[in-house]
Swiss-Prot record:
Pfam families tied to this protein: Methyltransf_5
Keyword line: Cytoplasm, Methyltransferase, rRNA processing, S-adenosyl-L-methionine, Transferase
GO biological-process terms attached to the record: rRNA base methylation
Leading EC class: transferase
EC number from the UniProt entry: 2.1.1.199
PANTHER family: 12S RRNA N4-METHYLCYTIDINE METHYLTRANSFERASE, S-ADENOSYL-METHYLTRANSFERASE MRAW
A cellular-component GO term for this protein: cytoplasm
Location(s) in or outside the cell: Cytoplasm
Entry superkingdom: Bacteria
Protein name, UniProt field: Ribosomal RNA small subunit methyltransferase H
Length: 310
């Protein structure tokens, strides 16, 4: 299957990065290289793009899309490892970092990946298929309390306790092996009236399991800190999020980096000595235009946040 992915907030990202033609830029989620192709188009031959992705399918597609560009370094890894990646490339500082935290259209549409509740497939959801740990392990091995906590915290699902209980009871009979088996269990756990209203009843639970499989939220804070430390003065970090949990983490971390002072509020002046590391470029975040949402409905929940290194 062809790797298809429509880049979200494309023009906004390119503008936000404030690209220098001879700069070094990192795309931490290379994907189908939609954003990266536009970054490269703004670079001279003296500039460089480092494309990171943990999905080999994505890297293969990106190499094909960017085959006419020579100033690209491809890295099969997770953006969590940005420090060691730059060390291995003997690069100390960069001028911009982009991270698009969404699941690609390809990953959703490729049934075998097990990300979608709309297509039947083995329970998988691994961004990096070289890892052994998958959705199957969570659904069939986690105890009821752990399942409840994940579905509640990562999915913000109001029926998390019932869903966890129904999963436990079903797997007593036999292992839960496919996405549609899990969807049926979730539907049975949610009251009929609630199933008829709002988004697909499995959406939040699938999101929660995917986040747990790929440790998505656990790695964000460290990645932001390490990335900011690697930015040149005036360099920018742009992050696209797709749900409130991610956005909250990014917003709070950006706020902390902009105002790291730990002095009590009643102190008339700062004595902790911690000075701001960044300037927030888009405090409220940047949302897609109405036109973009109409063209690409999956962009509806996207939000772009941007900081600049001081």
């Amino acid at each position: 299957m062809e790797f298809k992915h429509v880049s979200v907030l494309l023009n906004e990202c390119i503008e936000a990065l404030n690209i220098k033609e001879n700069g070094i830029y990192v795309d931490g989620t290379l994907g189908g290289a939609g954003h990266s192709s536009h970054i490269l188009s703004n670079l001279s031959k003296d500039g460089m793009l480092i494309g990171i992705d943990q999905d080999q399918d994505a890297l293969k597609a990106a190499k094909e899309k960017l085959k006419d560009f020579e100033n690209v370094k491809y890295v099969h890894s997770n953006f969590y490892n940005i420090d060691s990646i730059l060390n291995d490339l003997d690069i100390e500082k960069v001028d911009g970092i982009l991270m698009d935290l969404g699941v690609s259209s390809y990953q959703l549409d490729e049934a075998s990946r097990g990300f979608s509740y709309m297509k039947d497939a083995p329970l998988d959801m691994r961004m990096n298929r070289e890892n052994d740990f998958s959705a199957y392990n969570i659904v069939n091995n986690y105890d009821e309390d752990s399942l409840y906590k994940i579905i509640k915290d990562y999915g913000e699902e109001r029926f998390a306790k019932r869903i966890a209980n129904f999963i436990i009871n079903r797997r007593i009979e036999k292992p839960i092996e496919t996405t549609f088996e899990l969807v049926d269990i979730i539907k049975a756990a949610i009251p009929a009236k609630m199933r008829r209203e709002g988004p697909h009843p499995a959406k939040r639970t699938f999101q929660a399991i995917r986040i747990e499989v790929n440790s998505e939220l656990k790695i964000l804070n460290k990645t932001i800190e390490d990335g900011v430390n690697r930015l040149n003065k005036g360099g920018r970090m742009a992050i696209i999020t797709f749900h409130s949990l991610e956005d909250r983490i990014v917003k709070l971390k950006f706020r902390e980096l902009e105002n790291p002072c730990t002095c009590p509020k009643e102190f008339p002046m700062c004595i902790c000595g911690k000075s701001p590391l960044v300037k927030n470029i888009a405090k409220k975040g940047i949302a897609p235009t109405k036109e973009e949402i109409e063209e690409n409905p999956r962009s509806r929940s996207a939000k772009l946040r941007v900081i600049e290194k001081l």
